[in-house]
């Protein structure tokens, strides 16, 4: 029980004091004069100049009031002092009224330890469980606060924004990789089968052709150095790749990609792109039977480059809320996806800076591979530029979907081209050996014919090599093999994967999808935070007066010292450990009051 003096003077009994001895709320003052003025302005129920307190020994302090109990029904608070000893005011809760007789009422009370000792105790750094905190910085950016509140926020999100970002808008690249060069460099003579080893990130022997195009089948205007190149349509490019003699069976990979690993200069409105002539050259693939194909040949790339896409303010599109914490994860989340099975979730509060920037990396490899990472995500401010770049790779979306274009292997053309001279030599050999057989040189000549035959001569297998008739059968067998090859359908040696589905449905680049919890839960959590602040879990000085209207404070084993009796001091500690709202404005208990940071 709190300490109670033996007697009091200037006893004043009030009504309409808006807090009680449960200590859920109290009025907080900056000085004793403001405190006295607040209570003294409350409606007075009764005044006693001087009285003795009874029941102190039993722990039930009360005073006898010469007033009917009906006249005291609304009495809820009392203040007094003892002018014989000091001018200190004691503040008390009226706890009970007891009928004595028609003109006398016992009024029971207990000391309000918070108001009585408000200016006699002070906090030391204490473990703060929860309190009202600063929510926004000087630039009106939400301060990071991600401590779990332990509250239900639902199981579903509302999608509030979806934006698609492509490295070069509608521009795409078809990458064709061949075993050898398919064109002649200006001023040189074309040599079929020439291996043109070069640097493509690393030394390698393949030849790379890059063919830019749009989804409508057109191509951009291309400038390489100071030379303009009119690139062929992608359909013309493909048609000729599988008909020209030195291109058929030369192609080892063919795929479509959004980014070739180089931050090229591209004007989307003018549909023009510029390439460095140190890296690329104009390639004209031609033979004497088919139209020329204009495309771009990769000369050399020593190091690839990233491209940065600025998607705008990282908290844009989320519902406005006075509680900054509701912009944090898990209440808000940004998903980056390509809708091809590759996805990362971003906690916006851990993106350094105001804007969400996506870094795109790629290459001209044997298959598609493009990565999308968030710039300066979870990167400490002490990291350097290169270290920041590396750190961002730690959280990346990697699109290594093949995006292949089907490669047709024309078996007939391949066989005829690769074995044309051999076939003619086999025919001559068979005829010669057939004649020699008739002259008696049979089995040795037939054995050489069998050795040179790609088909396997029937007579060779059975040992029948005795006449020119057998030679005719061999030639017929070889021609039948050629006919069989001609009747074989073209084979797909590299399937196209889901390229048609992905690109035909517009699934290119990445999508930035912003999601937040349902409005129902936003309102619940907002109301809770407005009333009780945020979890803090820090050892610090509590925020006792940092808001316009009220501060909630809850501690654990709080460290309070003061010039007062130990019993009351311990009770004050218990009150703050239980949590209390300190009101700075009236009406106390009105949580609709403006409660911005002071």
Swiss-Prot record:
Subcellular location: Virion
One GO CC term, this protein: virus tail, tube
One Pfam match: Caud_tail_N
Alphabetized InterPro entries for the sequence: Gp9_C (IPR048710), Gp9_N (IPR031772)
Keyword Hydrolase: no
A biological process from GO: symbiont genome ejection through host cell envelope, short tail mechanism
Superkingdom of the source species: Viruses
Chief location category: virion
UniProt keywords, alphabetically: Late protein, Pore-mediated penetration of viral genome into host cell, Viral genome ejection through host cell envelope, Viral penetration into host cytoplasm, Viral short tail ejection system, Viral tail protein, Viral tail tube protein, Virion, Virus entry into host cell
Function noted in UniProt: Distal (knob) tail protein that plugs the end of the tube before DNA ejection and forms a channel perforating the host membrane during ejection.
Family under the similarity heading: Belongs to the picovirinae distal tube protein family.
Subunit structure: Homohexamer; forms a hexameric tube structure with six flexible hydrophobic loops.
Name of the molecule in the record: Tail knob protein gp9
Organism encoding this protein: Bacillus phage B103
Gene designation per UniProt: 9
């Amino acid at each position: 029980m709190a300490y109670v003096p033996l007697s009091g003077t200037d006893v004043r009994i009030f009504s309409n004091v808006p807090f009680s001895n449960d200590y859920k709320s109290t009025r907080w003052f900056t000085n004793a004069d403001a405190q006295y003025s607040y209570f003294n302005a409350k409606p007075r129920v009764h005044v006693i100049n001087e009285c003795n307190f009874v029941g102190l020994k039993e722990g039930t302090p009360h005073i006898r009031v010469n007033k009917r109990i009906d006249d005291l029904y609304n009495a809820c608070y009392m203040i007094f002092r003892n002018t014989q000893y000091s001018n200190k005011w004691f503040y008390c809760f009226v706890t009970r009224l007891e009928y004595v007789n028609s003109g006398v009422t016992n009024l029971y009370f207990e000391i309000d330890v918070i108001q009585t000792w408000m200016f006699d105790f002070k906090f030391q750094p204490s473990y703060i469980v929860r309190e009202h905190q600063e929510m926004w910085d000087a630039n009106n950016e939400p301060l990071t606060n991600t401590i779990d509140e332990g509250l239900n926020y639902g199981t579903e999100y509302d999608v509030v924004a979806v934006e698609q970002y492509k490295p070069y808008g509608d521009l795409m690249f078809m990458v064709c990789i061949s075993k050898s060069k398919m064109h002649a460099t200006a001023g040189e003579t074309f040599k079929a089968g020439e291996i043109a080893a070069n640097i493509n990130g690393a030394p390698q022997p393949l030849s790379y052709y890059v063919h830019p195009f749009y989804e409508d089948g057109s191509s951009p205007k291309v400038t390489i150095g100071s030379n303009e190149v009119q690139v062929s349509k992608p359909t013309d490019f493909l048609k000729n790749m599988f008909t020209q003699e030195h291109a058929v069976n030369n192609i080892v990979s063919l795929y479509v990609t959004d980014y070739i690993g180089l931050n090229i200069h591209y004007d989307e409105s003018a549909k023009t792109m510029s390439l460095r002539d140190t890296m690329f050259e104009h390639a004209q693939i031609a033979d004497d039977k088919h139209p020329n194909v204009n495309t771009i040949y990769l000369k050399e790339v020593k190091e690839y480059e990233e491209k940065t896409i600025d998607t705008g303010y990282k908290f844009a599109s989320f519902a406005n809320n006075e509680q900054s914490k509701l912009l944090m994860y898990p209440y808000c989340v940004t998903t980056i996806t390509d809708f091809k099975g590759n996805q990362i979730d971003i906690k916006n509060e851990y993106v350094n800076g105001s804007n969400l920037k996506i870094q795109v990396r790629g290459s001209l490899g044997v298959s598609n591979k493009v990565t999308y990472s968030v710039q300066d995500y979870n990167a400490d401010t002490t990291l350097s530029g290169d270290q920041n770049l590396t750190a961002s790779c730690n959280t990346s979306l990697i699109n290594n979907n093949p995006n292949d274009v089907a490669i047709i292997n024309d078996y007939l053309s391949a066989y005829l081209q690769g074995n044309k001279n051999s076939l003619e030599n086999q025919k001559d050999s068979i005829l010669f050996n057939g004649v020699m057989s008739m002259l008696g040189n049979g089995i040795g000549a037939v054995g050489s014919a069998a050795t040179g035959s790609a088909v396997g001569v029937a007579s060779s297998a059975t040992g029948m090599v005795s006449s020119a008739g057998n030679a005719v059968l061999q030639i017929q067998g070889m021609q039948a093999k050629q006919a069989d090859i001609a009747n074989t359908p073209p084979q797909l040696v590299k399937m196209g994967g889901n390229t048609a589905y992905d690109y035909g449905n517009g699934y290119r680049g990445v999508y930035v999808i912003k999601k937040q919890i349902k409005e129902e839960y936003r309102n619940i959590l907002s109301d809770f935070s407005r009333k009780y602040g945020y979890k803090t879990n820090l050892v610090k000085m509590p925020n006792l007066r940092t808001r316009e209207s009220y501060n909630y404070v809850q501690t654990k084993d709080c460290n309070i010292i003061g010039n007062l009796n130990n019993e009351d001091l311990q009770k004050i500690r218990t009150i703050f450990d239980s949590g209390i709202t300190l009101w700075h404005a009236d009406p106390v208990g009105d949580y609709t009051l403006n409660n911005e940071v002071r």
